[in-house]
Amino acid sequence: MQNNNDILKAQSPAALAEEYIVKSIWQDVFPAGSNLPSERDLADKIGVTRTTLREVLQRLARDGWLTIQHGKPTKVNNIWDAAGPNIIETLIALDMQSAPLIIDNMLSLRSKMSESYIYEAVKNSPQKSTALFAELEQLQNTAQDYTEFDYQLFRQFTVVANKPFYRLIFNSLKGVYQRIGLLFFKEKKHRELTKQFYLEMQQICLEGNADAVVDCIRKHNLRSSTYWKAILERLPQNLSD
C-alpha cells in the first residue's frame, strides 16, 4: 500500500474521522489484523466526540474496513478479503497509482457481465430491450448526457434480464462509473463511436437477434480499447474530487 501523507481534506467531524481511519489503515498505521486504539484515545486523537466516532466505526464496519467485537477492541480487516466494490471510489482516492488497474478491472467486469445479461434480455424480451433505447433520438451530444444514458442503459438491461445481482453491482459502482464516463465522453469522437454502438444494439433488439449481442459488444470494446488505454494512462489526479 502506498504511503500518502496528504493533509486531511474532510470538513465535517464524521468525514474527518472516517478519512483519518481509512488513510491510517491504507498506510498501515493500523495494519490489517491489528486492533484500533480505544474509542476514547482515538476520539481524542482525531478531535471528535465518541458518539461521532462510534457512528463512523459502524459505517466502516459495514463497508468491510473493520470488525466490531463487542467487549473487545475493534479489529482492522484486510479489505481485499472483507470489502466489496462499493469502496472502489475510496481506493482510487487513496492511491491514484492503482486507479488505472482498478478502473480497467471494472471496465472488463462490465464487458463480461453485459455479454451475458444483455444476451438474456434480448432473448427473453426483445420488446422491453428495444424500449430501453426510446430516448436515444433525444440524446443530447454532451458528456453528461452520454454518461447518464450509458449507465442507465447497461443497468436497465439487468432489469430486463432479471439479473438483480448484476443490478446491485451497478448500484455500487455508480459513482466511479459516472466519473470515468465523463472522462470518456468529453471527446466528440468517443460519443460518435458509442452512438454507433447504441444504434447497432437497438437494431439487434428490434430484430430479437440475441445471437448477435456478444459479437456487437466485443467489436465495440475493441474499437474503443485504444481510447480507453489513452485515458487510463493520463488519469487526472483530482479524479476522486
Curated annotation (Swiss-Prot):
SMART domains: HTH_GNTR. The keyword Nuclease does not apply. One of its GO terms (biological process) is regulation of fatty acid metabolic process. Keywords: Activator, Cytoplasm, DNA-binding, Fatty acid metabolism, Lipid metabolism, Repressor, Transcription, Transcription regulation. Pfam families: FadR_C, GntR. PROSITE patterns: HTH_GNTR. GO terms for molecular function: DNA binding; DNA-binding transcription factor activity; fatty-acyl-CoA binding. Disulfide bonds: none annotated. GO terms for cellular component: cytoplasm. Residues 39-58 bind DNA. It is found in: Cytoplasm. SUPFAM superfamilies: GntR ligand-binding domain-like (SSF48008), Winged helix' DNA-binding domain (SSF46785). Residues 11-79 form the HTH gntR-type domain. Homodimer. HAMAP family: HTH_FadR (MF_00696). Multifunctional regulator of fatty acid metabolism. This is Fatty acid metabolism regulator protein. It comes from Haemophilus influenzae (strain ATCC 51907 / DSM 11121 / KW20 / Rd). The lineage of its organism: Bacteria, Pseudomonadati, Pseudomonadota, Gammaproteobacteria, Pasteurellales. The gene is fadR.
